[in-house]
Swiss-Prot record:
GO biological process terms on file: pyrimidine nucleobase biosynthetic process; regulation of gene expression; UMP biosynthetic process
Gene3D superfamilies: 3.40.50.2020
Entry GO MF terms: DNA binding; orotate phosphoribosyltransferase activity
InterPro entries: GfcR-like, PRibTrfase_dom, PRTase-like
UniProt xrefs under PANTHER family: OROTATE PHOSPHORIBOSYLTRANSFERASE, PYRE-LIKE PROTEIN
Protein family according to the UniProt entry: Belongs to the purine/pyrimidine phosphoribosyltransferase family. GfcR subfamily.
Pfam families cross-referenced by the UniProt entry: Pribosyltran
NCBIfam families the UniProt entry points to: PRK02277.1 (NF002620)
The protein, known as: Transcriptional regulator GfcR
Domain comment quoted from the record: Contains an N-terminal DNA-binding winged helix-turn-helix domain and a C-terminal regulatory domain (or effector binding domain) resembling phosphoribosyltransferase (PRT) domain.
Record keywords, A-Z: DNA-binding, Transcription, Transcription regulation
Length: 205
């Protein structure tokens, strides 16, 4: 496992970030983030991932050179706008936090209503049961056709949660992500579109 990734996870943990936020920041699954924060020091000492965990694979995606630049993000958003040319919709929902910058740029480019969905993994509460929520401009999407935007889809849990929530107040038509790690094409009848998709190929000698 990449040493740099382990060090980043431990640094975020020490800064007080919960596993969900670490996963979001590093574009890894929540399970991987939890594993790194609990076992990071031992992994660094060992110099490699323990053998018993060698079959548990996750893919680390880093696109800081893109998301750190508003110009580059706008270029990505224009690609998504082109993919949206045959979709009729009224509003855009960005999944917090990674999908918000892109959703903002797309809504500006297409002059569409904009809203934010905050998944439950970002809701810090002591309650055992919690849900995500629409964090901005909810009234603009109620009863409307909407598309959902996120940067990276790892397990699909946040997207599935967002779709389920929005189906109670609106009509989600499609999901657009920059990078898909899940291999999922559809969730609850809603099509998932991606710019890039990753996968693991098992090559046996």
């Amino acid at each position: 496992m990449k040493k740099e990734l382990i060090l980043k996870a431990l640094k975020l943990r020490d800064m007080g970030f919960p596993s969900g936020d670490i996963a979001e920041e590093l574009n890894i699954s929540v399970k991987t983030a939890l594993y790194l924060t609990l076992n990071g020091e031992e992994l660094l000492k060992a110099g490699e991932t323990p053998k018993e965990d060698s079959e548990k694979l996750d893919i680390f995606l880093e696109w800081d050179n893109v998301r750190a630049s508003s110009r580059r993000l706008r270029n990505i958003s224009k690609i998504i706008c082109d993919m949206l040319s045959d979709v009729e919709f009224d509003g855009i929902v960005g999944i917090s936090s990674g999908g918000v910058p892109l959703a903002t740029l797309i809504s500006d480019e297409l002059d569409k209503n904009f809203s934010i969905y905050v998944p439950k993994k970002h809701v810090h509460t002591e309650k055992e049961k919690t849900t995500g929520f629409i964090g901005q401009n909810m009234s603009s999407i109620v009863g409307k056709d909407v598309i959902i935007v996120d940067d990276v889809m790892t397990s699909g849990n946040s997207v599935k949660e967002t779709i389920k929530y929005l189906k109670g107040i609106a009509n989600p038509k499609k999901v657009f992500v920059v990078m898909d790690k899940s291999g999922i094409d559809e969730i609850d009848g809603v099509r998932i579109e991606h710019l890039f998709r990753t996968g693991v190929v098992d090559i046996k000698k």
